């Protein structure tokens, strides 16, 4: 039996990390944590490649050892810690707050938020079950286990989780008419209103979604993350508000910026 893999070649790293092919042989391999390797971004890459606060890997590690970076309210000093969708990254020394969100090309964007919005995060409910002595337990997609949740919260619903008190303050049902963010598949990063649910026996359910520009698309239920009641989002959205432009629309936008 072989042990765990400890290295990651740059060519095998997720494409959304946007690493230079000629920048070296290896990439940072994220530690096991709340997010999967292919769906996460290590803290060192966030500081160096996204924020440009460090010129190299060593500088990023030195910033983290000063205990000034918090992820979801907890100080993180490991440069391999995997940050992922909806995580709140706070840098105390500069009083900056960021939420990890996808753009419409599936890449993590540096989305700055206000201090008031940094107090909470949204978590998708992965399972609801009972454990020893009949205690109800809820698990979320970011690895949290919460005891004695609201009995009305079901699988695929979204909870509003207060980071400072570690309590559920609100919940949003997974139902038609609510606003959702797509977190995987070819439509990753798109935002729209949930339409009808297509149930397929023996296969994953298909959810039909329509964005604010009137474009309709469909994706698997596992890729749908509810972020608001009706058409009002509970969190601020990055530039573009999750609307994917066609190739022609992107070209026209670039031409307009040049003139």
Curated annotation (Swiss-Prot):
Keywords: Ribonucleoprotein, Ribosomal protein, RNA-binding, rRNA-binding
Record-annotated membrane-spanning stretches: none
Keyword field contains rRNA-binding: yes
Single GO BP term: translation
GO CC term (a single one): cytosolic small ribosomal subunit
InterPro entries in the cross-refs: Rib_uL2_dom2, Ribosomal_eS4, Ribosomal_eS4_C, Ribosomal_eS4_central_region, Ribosomal_eS4_central_sf, Ribosomal_eS4_KOW, Ribosomal_eS4_N, Ribosomal_eS4_N_CS
Any GO molecular function: rRNA binding
Similarity remark: Belongs to the eukaryotic ribosomal protein eS4 family.
NCBIfam families from the UniProt entry: PRK04313.1
Name of the protein in question: Small ribosomal subunit protein eS4
């Amino acid at each position: 039996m072989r042990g765990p893999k400890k290295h990651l070649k740059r060519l095998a790293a997720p494409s959304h990390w946007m690493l230079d092919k000629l920048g070296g042989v290896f990439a940072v391999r994220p530690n096991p944590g709340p997010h999967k390797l292919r769906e996460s971004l290590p803290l060192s890459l966030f500081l160096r490649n996204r924020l440009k606060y460090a010129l190299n890997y060593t500088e990023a590690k030195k910033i983290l050892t000063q205990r000034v970076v918090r992820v979801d309210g907890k100080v993180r000093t490991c440069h391999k810690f995997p940050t992922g969708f909806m995580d709140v990254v706070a840098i105390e020394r500069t009083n900056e707050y960021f939420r990890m969100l996808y753009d419409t090309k599936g890449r993590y964007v540096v989305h700055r938020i206000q201090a008031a919005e940094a107090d909470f995060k949204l978590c998708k409910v992965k399972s609801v079950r009972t454990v020893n002595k009949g205690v109800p337990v809820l698990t979320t997609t970011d690895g949290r286990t919460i005891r004695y949740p609201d009995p009305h919260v079901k699988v695929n619903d979204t909870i509003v989780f207060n980071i400072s008190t570690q309590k559920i303050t609100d919940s949003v049902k997974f139902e038609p008419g609510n606003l959702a963010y797509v977190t995987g598949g070819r439509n990753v990063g798109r935002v729209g209103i949930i339409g009808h649910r297509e149930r397929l026996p023996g296969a994953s359910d298909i959810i039909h979604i329509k964005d604010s520009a009137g474009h309709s698309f469909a994706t698997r239920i596992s890729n749908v993350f509810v972020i608001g009641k009706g058409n009002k989002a509970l969190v601020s959205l990055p530039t573009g508000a999750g609307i994917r432009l066609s190739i022609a629309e992107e070209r026209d936008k670039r031409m307009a910026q040049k003139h």
